[in-house]
Amino acid sequence: MAAVVEVEVGGGAAGERELDEVDMSDLSPEEQWRVEHARMHAKHRGHEAMHAEMVLILIATLVVAQLLLVQWKQRHPRSYNMVTLFQMWVVPLYFTVKLHWWRFLVIWILFSAVTAFVTFRATRKPLVQTTPRLVYKWFLLIYKISYATGIVGYMAVMFTLFGLNLLFKIKPEDAMDFGISLLFYGLYYGVLERDFAEMCADYMASTIGFYSESGMPTKHLSDSVCAVCGQQIFVDVSEEGIIENTYRLSCNHVFHEFCIRGWCIVGKKQTCPYCKEKVDLKRMFSNPWERPHVMYGQLLDWLRYLVAWQPVIIGVVQGINYILGLE
């Protein structure tokens, strides 16, 4: 059994020299961590006032950044959403390459390739008739996969906290890493696909002409036409469809199942695509497991801020500290 290293840090430069002379090659990973921890404390001894300034700078920057982001989102939501989506897409790529997370990189490349193709199809004019259904099916699939992955990851974390991993002879750190990884995958791709779907939904719906962001639709909606994809509806609301059913909203407008699910759940729309009347989701989705969960949506919004803007804010704080000579 390896001996336990007791690290005593002396004062000033002498203490730092003692720590620098420790041979790290013969130590266990835990002992190496203790030595590194002691070195950090020795390096920053006597910097309490400087650290207090750095904390104040961090808090002030977070408050100012939050106010600026809120104002930007309220005044120019379109540019805010586009910049946030771009950062959500590329910021993790930097950390993935830097930290050699190759599994995440492979999944990111596959998701980006298919999503780029789907987004390209959604932004073409004239819009191909099969494109809206392709877009909503793809993003609805990713939504379900990410939701299920997040649930499994959350359950793995909770089981680890309650010690149930010991029943399967799994180490707590391995079980926790597995749960947190799945939870992050589910939440990250859940945020990304919802933002892409919202952008595609607005673009396609305005191109088809039954929906406009402001003002009246440019086309009149027939009773047998879906306002999301513009295609004919062949299955009656009261009939059971072979591939998909037909849904009727509280405003009496009817839609394909995949289209309205993609519009409301994935595209984050809470109004009718044609008349903009508020959608009663509880009435439309009678099964409680199908209802979009409010807390899940709020959690995705929080993760969007964390991934897209937190690295930028931390970078600004580090730049201020560097200019002021704080460390």
From Swiss-Prot:
N-acetylalanine, modified sites: A2
GO BP terms: ERAD pathway; protein ubiquitination
Membrane topology listed for this record: Multi-pass membrane protein
Zinc finger motifs (RING-type), residue ranges: 226-276
Keyword Metal-binding found: yes
Keywords noted in UniProt: Acetylation, Endoplasmic reticulum, Membrane, Metal-binding, Transferase, Transmembrane, Transmembrane helix, Zinc, Zinc-finger
EC annotation from Swiss-Prot or TrEMBL: 2.3.2.27
Residue ranges crossing the lipid bilayer per the database entry: 50-70, 79-99, 100-120, 148-168, 172-192, 306-326
Coiled-coil segments on the chain, per record: none
Molecular-function annotations in GO: ubiquitin protein ligase activity; zinc ion binding
Record's keyword annotation contains Zinc: yes
Reactions the enzyme catalyzes: S-ubiquitinyl-[E2 ubiquitin-conjugating enzyme]-L-cysteine + [acceptor protein]-L-lysine = [E2 ubiquitin-conjugating enzyme]-L-cysteine + N(6)-ubiquitinyl-[acceptor protein]-L-lysine
Superkingdom of the source species: Eukaryota
Pathway connected to this protein: Protein modification; protein ubiquitination
Location(s), subcellular: Endoplasmic reticulum membrane
Disulphide bridges: none
PANTHER family: E3 UBIQUITIN LIGASE RNF121, RNF121 PROTEIN
Family according to the record: Belongs to the RNF121 family.
Protein name (database record): E3 ubiquitin ligase RNF121
Organism: Homo sapiens (Human)
Gene: RNF121
